[in-house]
């Protein structure tokens, strides 16, 4: 993976629905320009001038994990092309992502997931086993 990131100029995620978007987060940690859609969780972790606007679309039919009628983003392909052209014309190979680094640093991960999440679950378990609520 490191070799792929080293050879790349820019990371593009043009998805209709995305959770955190670990590929985009990994690229941001490596200070690559990142193009993402506004629909999903990536914008919570990555600040970039390249956020593609999305309309809403309903899925027309059931698929493996998805049901007809579910709503997803419908990213603007014209805006994607403008962002890609802009990054190319500026010859961007570096973009600082302090928010992403702060959210993914060891100290924050330990606090958010180990102390806050696991710690709270342990408190809930010990309270329930002692008969307290």
Language-model features: locations:
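A charged, aromatic-enriched C-terminal amphipathic alpha-helix characteristic of glycosyltransferases
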Residues: 71-79, 88-118
């Amino acid at each position: 993976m490191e070799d792929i990131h080293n050879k790349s100029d820019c990371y593009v995620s043009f998805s209709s629905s995305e959770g955190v978007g670990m590929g985009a987060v990994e690229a941001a940690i490596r200070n690559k320009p990142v193009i993402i859609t506004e629909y999903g969780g990536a914008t919570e972790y990555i600040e970039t001038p390249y956020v593609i606007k999305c309309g809403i679309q309903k899925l027309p039919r059931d698929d493996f994990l998805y049901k007809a009628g579910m709503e997803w983003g419908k990213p603007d392909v014209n805006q994607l092309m403008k962002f890609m052209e802009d990054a190319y014309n500026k010859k961007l190979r570096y973009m600082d992502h302090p928010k992403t680094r702060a959210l993914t640093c060891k100290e924050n991960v330990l606090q958010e997931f180990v102390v806050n999440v696991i710690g709270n679950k342990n408190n809930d378990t010990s309270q329930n086993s002692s008969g307290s609520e």
